[in-house]
Design a protein with these regions (language model features):
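PLP-dependent amino-acid enzyme catalytic core
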Residues: 1-142
Length: 142
């Protein structure tokens, strides 16, 4: 399997910022899939394969709707794993399109809790999917 693009992660440019104090800033947006989350997604899959808890037949599941979801979808595509992404109705249309481009299966949580948050419902859906889908792996960023 050619993981060349994964090996490119983290090799992002730095720029010098003049000021008091002066400092260098690393431009993580130059990672292949657009954010620092690329590294975490690649690490999860690499480590899972090394420890043999993930195989090519494993369905990767996570509750995320932003940069981590996009990075996981892309990395799963490289490894040829199915990626199921649990999101809520606040998913940005552009992120939905990107996830679809990486063939992510999208499950939408539509019930908010008493505080208006969807996180509990999203996590309940993830747990249900883990129970129902054989050979699945929950990344569990929380």
């Amino acid at each position: 399997m050619n993981l060349g693009i994964i090996n490119a992660m983290g090799n992002t440019p730095t720029v010098f910022i003049h000021g008091s104090p002066s400092y260098y800033a690393k431009l993580e947006g130059f990672n292949p899939f657009g954010s620092i989350k690329d590294r975490a997604a690649a690490y999860v899959l690499q480590k899972g394969y090394e420890e043999e808890v993930i195989t090519p037949k494993t369905n990767i599941i996570e509750s995320s709707s932003g940069n981590f979801a996009i990075a996981l979808a892309a990395v799963c595509q490289i490894y040829r794993n199915v990626f199921t992404c649990v999101v809520d109705k606040n998913l940005l249309p552009i992120n939905k399109k990107i996830l679809e481009c990486y063939n992510a299966k999208i499950v939408i949580a539509d019930k908010a809790d008493e505080n208006g948050s969807y996180l509990k419902n999203r996590l309940d859906i993830v747990k249900d999917l883990i129970d129902k889908i054989d050979n699945s792996y929950w990344v569990n960023q929380y």
